[in-house]
């Protein structure tokens, strides 16, 4: 017998070992779920055509998966249990089933994913599975608190070492639930990230000691997956010693240029890297890495990033950094078959839009790029990247304004969490009734005189989707798309319009 599973029983009751099989049942359902995800991906590839109605064509909706798991755990939790007489058996079972789900939950966020999926595809499932796991653990903990209170033994039972280890994890889970709320997460993201990962590691380690019968097999699986993630990060990290930061007075956007390493594999358009401190710096292991979309194509000599200035992670040209990736963000099948496309982006979302636009420009029948920014000073990124294609630019602040206010920087996910930031340039704009003023600009100056030779079409005011996407709607084809990249508010507005006008839609969300 595994040493970790040989602890003598410390919870009373003759049903001590009755729940062991339920952990294996949950583990089995986890394997079935992974197989189901793979089947969906295979069917998606086989059935993908130019007339497909979108990426979610064969994917099961997230809420169905979560409801299914919730019903499975509740059903197994009370199955063959005479309530309320044997409720202790039930609360023990919820604790074991929660722990048995941990390997599956960690597996969902491996980077790169070992089953060939983009890890971002599984991030929402990971977040909700984490909530299901915590819910089961809380049922287990609250159940025992009630039992001990009724017995009058709350203090004596709580201070016992093995019980106390479980209480520590219980309290960490409660703290994590509170600070994971959007209000707190957006304001203290780094601390949320640290607490999140500490909770994961202690959940794996302390519950291995707390649980009886033992859960050694699950603990080994979890530790192996976490160890694999650390090894992958160490083995596949790239060092940076000559990072170049290009800024412009009055702009909140900066361009970061990294010399491309010849060993770096090609990446599909829209891919991203994760930038952090050197691996020898403790901060690279404690705090979250920072994901930035690659604004250049795989054929370019430089690896360019367009990012918002941040007080959380300030880049200095003379300092060393490290990064991992590139990680794919966009469906290869979609890029190969998509046609008739309007791309709309906000702020630093242009970093996602530019390479996708350049890629589609070579093969799509119709491609249009729309960019929303608060200040015309942000246009310096186009000049820096030598972008000379036609683009419609909406200046949503005062045309004469030299500042570009951004309330939140674009943070994202870490080892076991996916989060980014909400920074929508259109949120504080005039109403849609505000008249737009169109200006052609070639020199990025504030000269409002039309210049026919210019490819930058500048419009003051927020975009009117009806006018913006008018040419796309008129295309006589079912293979027409809107790609939105930026904050959730922009993406949701574009998605709603696309749905109402029967246009296919795909997005990249920047939010926290």
From Swiss-Prot:
Protein task: Probable cell surface metalloreductase. May be involved in iron or copper homeostasis.
Domain Ferric oxidoreductase: 94-206
Region (Disordered): 427-451
Principal subcellular localisation of the protein: membrane
Lineage of producing organism: Eukaryota, Fungi, Dikarya, Ascomycota, Saccharomycotina
Residue stretches spanning the membrane: 20-40, 61-81, 97-117, 132-152, 161-181, 191-211, 218-235
Gene this chain is encoded by: AIM14
Protein's recorded name: Probable metalloreductase AIM14
Family designation: Belongs to the ferric reductase (FRE) family. AIM14 subfamily.
CDD domains in the record: NOX_Duox_like_FAD_NADP
Cystine crosslinks: none
Membrane topology: Multi-pass membrane protein
Record's compositionally biased regions (Polar residues): 437-447
Signal peptide boundaries: none
Organism of provenance: Debaryomyces hansenii (strain ATCC 36239 / CBS 767 / BCRC 21394 / JCM 1990 / NBRC 0083 / IGC 2968)
GO BP: apoptotic process; reductive iron assimilation; regulation of actin cytoskeleton organization
Cell compartment(s), UniProt: Membrane
Start-end of Low complexity biased regions: 427-436
EC number: 1.16.1.-
One Gene Ontology term, aspect cellular component: perinuclear endoplasmic reticulum
Enzyme class: oxidoreductase
Keywords, in A-Z order: Electron transport, FAD, Flavoprotein, Ion transport, Membrane, NADP, Oxidoreductase, Transmembrane, Transmembrane helix, Transport
Occurrences of domain FAD-binding FR-type (ranges): 230-355
GO molecular function, one term: ferric-chelate reductase activity
């Amino acid at each position: 017998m595994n040493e970790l599973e040989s602890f003598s029983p410390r919870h009373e009751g003759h049903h001590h070992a009755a729940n062991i099989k339920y952990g294996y049942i949950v583990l089995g359902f986890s394997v079935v779920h992974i197989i189901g995800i793979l089947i969906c991906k295979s069917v998606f590839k086989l059935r993908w055509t130019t007339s497909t109605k979108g990426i979610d064509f064969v994917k099961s909706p997230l809420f169905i998966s979560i409801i299914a798991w919730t019903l499975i755990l509740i059903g197994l939790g009370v199955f063959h249990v005479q309530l309320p007489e044997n409720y202790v058996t039930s609360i023990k079972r919820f604790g074991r089933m929660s722990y048995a789900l941990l390997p599956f939950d960690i597996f969902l966020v491996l980077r790169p994913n070992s089953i060939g999926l983009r890890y971002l595809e599984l991030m929402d499932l990971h977040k909700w599975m984490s909530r299901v796991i915590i819910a089961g653990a809380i049922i287990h903990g609250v159940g025992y608190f009630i039992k001990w209170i009724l017995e009058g033994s709350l203090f004596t039972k709580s201070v016992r070492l093995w019980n106390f280890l479980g209480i520590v994890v219980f309290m960490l889970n409660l703290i994590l639930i509170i600070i994971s709320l959007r209000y707190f997460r957006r304001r203290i993201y780094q601390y949320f990230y640290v607490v999140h990962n500490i909770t994961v590691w202690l959940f794996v380690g302390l519950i291995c000691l707390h649980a009886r019968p033992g859960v050694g097999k699950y603990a080994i699986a979890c530790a192996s997956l976490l160890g694999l993630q650390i090894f992958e990060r160490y083995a596949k990290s790239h060092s940076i010693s000559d990072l170049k930061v290009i800024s412009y007075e009055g702009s909140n956007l900066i361009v970061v240029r990294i010399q491309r390493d010849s060993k770096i594999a090609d990446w599909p358009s829209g891919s991203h890297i994760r930038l952090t401190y050197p691996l020898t710096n403790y901060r690279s292991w404690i705090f979250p890495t920072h994901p930035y979309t690659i604004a250049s194509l795989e054929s370019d000599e430089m690896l360019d990033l367009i990012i918002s200035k941040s007080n959380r992670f300030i880049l200095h040209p003379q300092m060393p950094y490290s990064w991992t990736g590139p990680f794919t963000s966009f469906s290869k099948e979609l890029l190969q078959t998509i046609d008739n496309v309007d791309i709309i982006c906000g702020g630093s979302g242009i970093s996602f839009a530019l390479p996708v636009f350049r890629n589609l420009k070579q093969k799509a029948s119709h491609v249009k790029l729309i960019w929303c920014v608060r200040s015309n000073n942000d246009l310096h990124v186009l000049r820096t990247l030598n972008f000379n294609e036609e683009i419609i630019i909406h200046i949503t602040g005062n045309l004469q304004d030299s500042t570009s206010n951004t309330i939140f920087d674009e943070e994202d996910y870490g080892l076991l969490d996916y989060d980014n930031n909400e920074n929508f340039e259109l949120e504080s704009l005039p109403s849609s009734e505000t008249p737009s003023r169109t200006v052609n600009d070639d020199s990025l100056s504030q000269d409002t005189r039309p210049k026919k030779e210019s490819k930058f079409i500048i419009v003051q005011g927020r975009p009117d989707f009806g006018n913006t996407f008018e040419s796309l709607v008129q295309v006589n084809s079912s293979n027409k798309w809107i790609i939105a990249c930026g904050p959730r508010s922009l993406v949701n507005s574009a998605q709603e319009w696309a749905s109402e006008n029967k246009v296919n839609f795909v997005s990249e969300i920047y939010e926290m």
